[in-house]
Amino acid sequence: MSKTTLIYVAVVDDDEHLCRSLGRLLRAGGIQPITYASAEAFLADTKHPQFDCLLLDIQLDGMSGIELARRLTAEGCHPPIIFITAHDNPDIRAEAEAAGCTAYFRKSDSGAEVLDAIRRAGGLNRTI
């Protein structure tokens, strides 16, 4: 009998409906999501498990997903980061890539593609 290791993913998005939808999608895919309504809420949660991947909305109220990624990098944390956005444009995409994203999706992209990217990123070491 093989033992399955859970993949823990932080989902940071201020759209409550999207967080619920992503949570259902990830759980159905065997991934354990923990959702946060803001970057600040994520940073304030000191009792979270080690995450295998972060799924960050780019345009959040308060600190943006890109600012959160930069802050984590400055603090020596280098988790795999997947950015999602409803407002795609070349400048935002370039900024996300400069912040070190593993993958980048529009919120309208396929859930299967997002799951595949998380599974690939989840194979990396837990870093936060």
For every predicted segment, state its role.
Residues 1-10, 16-23, 38, 112-128:
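Non-catalytic signal-transmission and effector/linker regions of two-component phosphorelay proteins
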Residues 35-53:
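Acidic, metal-coordinating helix/loop segments flanking the phosphotransfer/catalytic sites
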Residues 44, 66-77:
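Short amphipathic alpha-helix used as the core "switch/output" element in two-component signaling
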Residues 57, 85:
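Active-site residues of response regulator receiver
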Residues 60-62:
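Receiver (REC) domain active-site loop signature in two-component systems and cognate sites
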Residues 67, 88-103, 109:
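Alpha4 helix (beta4-alpha4-beta5 surface) of REC/receiver domains from two-component response regulators
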Residues 75, 86-88:
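Short, conserved "switch-loop" micro-motifs in signal-transduction and mechanochemical regulators
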